[in-house]
Amino acid sequence: MGKKIRLTTAQALIKFLNQQYIHVDGKEEPFVEGIFTIFGHGNVLGIGQALEQDAGHLKVYQGKNEQGMAHAAMAYSKQMLRRKIYAVSTSVGPGAANLVAAAGTALANNIPVLLIPADTFATRQPDPVLQQMEQEYSAAITTNDALKPVSRYWDRITRPEQLMSSLLRAFEVMTDPAKAGPATICISQDVEGEAYDFDESFFVKRVHYIDRMQPSERELQGAAELIKSSKKPVILVGGGAKYSGARDELVAISEAYNIPLVETQAGKSTVEADFANNLGGMGITGTLAANKAARQADLIIGIGTRYTDFATSSKTAFDFDKAKFLNINVSRMQAYKLDAFQVVADAKVTLGKLHGLLEGYESEFGTTIRELKDEWLAERERLSKVTFKREAFDPEIKNHFSQEVLNEYADALNTELPQTTALLTINETIPEDSVIICSAGSLPGDLQRLWHSNVPNTYHLEYGYSCMGYEVSGTLGLKLAHPDREVYSIVGDGSFLMLHSELITAIQYNKKINVLLFDNSGFGCINNLQMDHGSGSYYCEFRTDDNQILNVDYAKVAEGYGAKTYRANTVEELKAALEDAKKQDVSTLIEMKVLPKTMTDGYDSWWHVGVAEVSEQESVQKAYEAKEKKLESAKQY
């Protein structure tokens, strides 16, 4: 059956990864860029030995936390529009367990990444080994089973020859636009070093062709009829539109037929913010302009969107009595949502073909799009100039903290800097082609409403899983994707404390990243949530046991790692820090102490959250009753 080559399982894995290519729109390039690893006794003598012997073209990076390096790998793949990946290798037990949150993040966002956790012995001879857990009812269960529900594909290798079919399945999944996500291949640590006579044909160059899925004539005609029969259609731009590269087609249809664009977090920066018909973010963290347009719509054209609760305001954002839905998505499952007419096809191709079928059509929005955008831009301008007053300050988040408490924060943190003012100062100061990243807390809402990205694919938000700690780790992935650009992590103190280990990795490998740390000494977003629903401020502020506000010197922490650091508590200090940071070759961190309750509030939106049905607090009871009342106007599925 052809020539054989004797390799260990790990050597075969690395040899195979070097031969995987992807072909999109006539361009062919290697699919696997490199591998992140933290060596332990489960992988150092297998995968470690294989990489040392011959890594091929793979770039190898030593991570500092398994979740962190997997986030970096995911961010790289997401930024590369899912056309390149990094693999991630860990040891057994806790190292593998640390992948669970990162795998869930990749799965929720449909991002391909190859996870290779080591496993316990296939022979079971030394069981239980170090870092192995035991279950009385099954010896077949290991820590790696926890990765099953958060993987798009999962397998366990207990024989070398199993690797071949497993890798083919994994790469089929990772290169499928409709079901891309994390592929997990667990390799027993004794099997990693076990040799086998592999067929040489397994290691030939393999090209994974990503052909654009074509819409059928029935789909095109049905979609065109829906649009032409509508009066006020709105296009909801999702992440699938960005991965498809549908920017030009979206702009052309929007301009030709006067159809407004609104965006999900994943779809933002598919089309530049200053495009006249782009009304910005949609839903709970959306702009007033986008949400007003959506309420007027009689047709929602969803392009590559999952219709999450944040995009649909928990299914209250639209007038479901009159609005119809047209979904264009490579995923059949996503296309079926909200009783839509389904076009299961590539966004770029479909929009290009639809354009010519709409000749003679024009929406009835008239000048409304411009008026809505102007109204919102005026509000954005106001939010850029918020100033704190110690006597009578009216924060964006109202009726939570008294003036006395706000003054206490100003004194404890030595700042009077509002969050929106700081954020928009950054937007105006950093290079236009910079890439920003964020994931959790109040900052994603501020960014979706306020941030203007005028270079496509420069806004990178992980808001499928909203995983705290993705922000700093992911910035390393951005830098690997864009080595010649400035990349910025926009992160709150809560997320920074959760995970920032790959800042050290960035410094170690001279991959300059910039961390913009907003410190309001607490979990401010969740504090807003609890107080908005009748509860008091309970264990979301960072206070000491004698109720003093915690003031951490994060700049000193980062300085200890080797970063260039700055403290900026005024607009002037912030501008100066940003300008100086551009000149640095090493990673930087700018620490900003910002006042609580100065993030943006919601605009004509609602979030369905669980509220206590029974409470001794009247305010909680009222919040529950208000929630039940609002549900009466929400679509139930």
Curated annotation (Swiss-Prot):
One of its GO terms (cellular component) is acetolactate synthase complex. Keywords: Hydrolase, Magnesium, Metal-binding, NAD, Thiamine pyrophosphate. It catalyses: 3D-3,5/4-trihydroxycyclohexane-1,2-dione + H2O = 5-deoxy-D-glucuronate + H(+). Residues 442-522 are annotated as: Thiamine pyrophosphate binding. Binds 1 Mg(2+) ion per subunit. Binds 1 thiamine pyrophosphate per subunit. SUPFAM superfamilies: DHS-like NAD/FAD-binding domain, Thiamin diphosphate-binding fold (THDP-binding). InterPro entries: DHS-like_NAD/FAD-binding_dom, Myo_inos_IolD, THcHDO_hydrolase_firmi, THDP-binding, Thiamin_PyroP_enz_cen_dom, Thiamin_PyroP_enz_TPP-bd_dom, TPP-bd_CS, TPP_enz. One of its GO terms (molecular function) is 3D-(3,5/4)-trihydroxycyclohexane-1,2-dione hydrolase activity. Thiamine diphosphate binds at E66. Mg(2+) binds at D493, N520. Pathway: Polyol metabolism; myo-inositol degradation into acetyl-CoA; acetyl-CoA from myo-inositol: step 3/7. Pfam families: TPP_enzyme_C, TPP_enzyme_M, TPP_enzyme_N. GO terms for biological process: inositol catabolic process; isoleucine biosynthetic process; L-valine biosynthetic process. Its EC number is 3.7.1.22. Its cofactor is Mg(2+); thiamine diphosphate. Belongs to the TPP enzyme family. Involved in the cleavage of the C1-C2 bond of 3D-(3,5/4)-trihydroxycyclohexane-1,2-dione (THcHDO) to yield 5-deoxy-glucuronate (5DG). This is 3D-(3,5/4)-trihydroxycyclohexane-1,2-dione hydrolase. It comes from Bacillus subtilis (strain 168).
